[in-house]
């Protein structure tokens, strides 16, 4: 079920990557992790303002200082709005994100975007590289605005299936679209 969390506010900031809201994820969490849902601004595949959603997964015992980011791009989960990983109970587990427990143990923060149009209203950029990549990079920007989550600019991009496609495009456009991030 898509709840009100995924609805865009009446006034959406023009700046892409702005954190609009966050709350606790109600699905399964990794044994040593804390999971939050985020809603943020992004730019769709056609360059128009859009809203995206996703998950931010951190260690329940974080190491001090800014932490590097693993930007996880999910594989195909369906093309409907209700197919967003952040709407599913097991999207923040080691079965959904390979090596998640090890990544958290090493102190990395995982940002896992749904891509715009999944969870949120709008066109879903299925295998449209620009849209997937912008949504992914903007999820990292939004996660950096979470309280008590200190993200370093160092970002490793990772994905499987559709997420592999998104990861390649994210790496391709990162320098121009999000120059503050070290992808």
Where are these regions (language model features)?
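Serine-hydrolase catalytic-loop signature spanning alpha/beta hydrolases and amidase-signature enzymes
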Residues: 77-79, 110, 142
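Primarily recognizes the serine-hydrolase "nucleophile elbow" in alpha/beta-hydrolase
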Residues: 141-183
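Short beta-to-alpha linker loops that shape the active-site pocket of alpha/beta-hydrolase fold enzymes
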Residues: 76, 114-118
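Short, surface-exposed "cap/lid" segments of acyl-processing enzymes
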Residues: 44-105
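Loop/turn elements at helix/coil->beta-strand transitions in domains of secreted/extracellular proteins
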Residues: 66-69, 106-111, 152-154, 179-183
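Catalytic-loop region of hydrolases
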Residues: 1-63
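Glycine-rich "HGGG/HGxG" loop immediately N-terminal to the catalytic nucleophile
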Residues: 117-125
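Alpha/beta-hydrolase active-site loop
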Residues: 99, 126-147
